[in-house]
Amino acid sequence: MQLNGWDHALKVTADGKGLVGHAGVILLRKAADMTGLTGQLSGALRQKGTSPLLDRGMVLASMAAAVALGATSMSDIALLAHLAPLLGTAPSGPTVRRALDLAGTPRALDRIARARAVARERAWSLIAAASSGFPWLAVAGKVLDGWVVIDMDATLVTAHSDKEGAAPAWKKGYGFHPLGAWCRNTRECLAMKLRPGNAGSNTFTDHEEVLSAALGQVPSRFRRKVLVRVDGAGASHDLIRHLLSLSSKRKTALFTTGWMITEADEDAIRMIPADAWKPGTRQDGTAENDKDVAEITGLLSRAENWPDGLRWIARRVKPSRRQARNLTAYEKQTGWRYSVTCTNIPDLGIAGVPGSHHPQFIDVLHREHAVVETAGVRTAKAMGLRGLPSKTWQVNCGWVIAANIAADLAAWTRLLGCHDDPELRDADPGTAPLPGLAPPRQARPTRPPAHPRHQPRLAMGRCVPDLLAAANRPVGTRMTSTNNPGNTKGGQPGAVGAGAHPVTPGTPAPHHQNQNGHEDQKRKPTQSVTGPRDA
């Protein structure tokens, strides 16, 4: 069975005939093929003694592409029906369910994780070789060159009916409580564990499992310097000991975590001299007003119960009206709201990052973890995790994997296909989906080239500008093609044909009367995609 090669003669035209919808999903499938993910998934889901009509790895990759388009159920695989002339017949809903049921088994989950790691190594190599380079994180105006940042967080997924594993959640909801780990640099979902709704927020075994799986997804050449950030809900003695044990002679693992304030912490804060409080720092490196930071490492009495090598940073801010209801007696007395960050960043700071030893830098570094709510959780819910489609636990585990793969494909498409456009490269799929995923295009067979050219990286960069131009063009703009000599009149490229009215961008199209005397808007050609004859 041919899993890829469907795009060996892919072209973009502007004649507006034979249109298909969701043509931008071609970029996602191209990313899966060029990184080797489709083939790796095929091997991971292959079973001895079976020969399904549709390869299960290809079905899972197709379902991930449909999830990126907004699929919320297994029957939404029909979103890919428009692309049948290019990708072939889309799988049916029952076929998708069987593939997800297979992918949700513990053995298949391990094999899929290894397959994703192999494809991710290829993708990160291509990203690093792009003109923009690998996206290193910048904090307080300082670039963490060479550091891979992993953010861990849990979220609630509501279940609107009885499903296997659903349980009452701590926020008085009902559903599931998955725990995930995201790469802040690329915004990929490295690992995620589906858990019942009543799962704890600071369960060490779950955090250890997800973190180990996430580190296994990081390519070995990028694993030498890793920074892990966890919020206060996930902090525990066991987790901090585990984070400290990750460092070795060959790799450095730093972390920051939130801290549940107790009376001992308030006693340490009371001992801070007034002149020790320094203004905090924003993400751009400028100073904050009425938001101060100070270190309490030597003042904290309960530090004896924790491992050596830790530092504690206190932060105080003026409480809002909403926060004023939950203040402690000491906070009400002082008029400040306090929070504490725990870290193992040494007194000398991070090597190669000037000023990283200051409490202000550590404070802003940990506060940047809040971005996981938008760049991680919101993106995940925009791509399939707003709800789980099945009543069975195993199928829902397979759906979570498909949603994670969809987030990976969207990230690779941004970083490889849009690497030369900072706005599109950093777009948030939750609020600004990739352009070109919905506009109709055309699929038409063409003769394959005699000697196909092999690109050193994703060849989809050739069609991205055309797709983006079509997606961003105003409604009233007349489209022309510089590659189509038929769009010329009188030797002038792009001239308007006889009987047509030229349209300027931003103005409504002209109206014409039909034979019945009614006005109808003249249809305009739309950009299109062509595929091979044997697609």
State what each model feature region is.
Residues 83, 245, 261, 271-278, ...:
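Short, well-ordered loop/turn and helix-capping segments at boundaries between secondary-structure elements
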Residues 31, 62-63, 74-77, 91-92, ...:
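Short, conserved catalytic/metal-binding motifs centered on acidic residues
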Residues 386-453:
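Basic, amphipathic alpha-helical segments enriched in Lys/Arg and hydrophobic/aromatic residues
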Residues 1-173, 180-200, 205-221, 249, ...:
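Dynamic "connector" segments at or just before major functional cores
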Residues 87, 157-159, 188, 198-201, ...:
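Flexible loop/turn segments at secondary-structure boundaries
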Residues 31, 77, 359-393, 398, ...:
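Short amphipathic alpha-helical "interface-anchor" segments enriched in bulky aromatics
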Residues 201-264:
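Domain-level cores of phosphate- or acyl-group-handling catalytic modules
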Residues 1-10, 252-374, 381, 468-481, ...:
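An anionic, glycine-rich sequence signature occurring as long contiguous blocks
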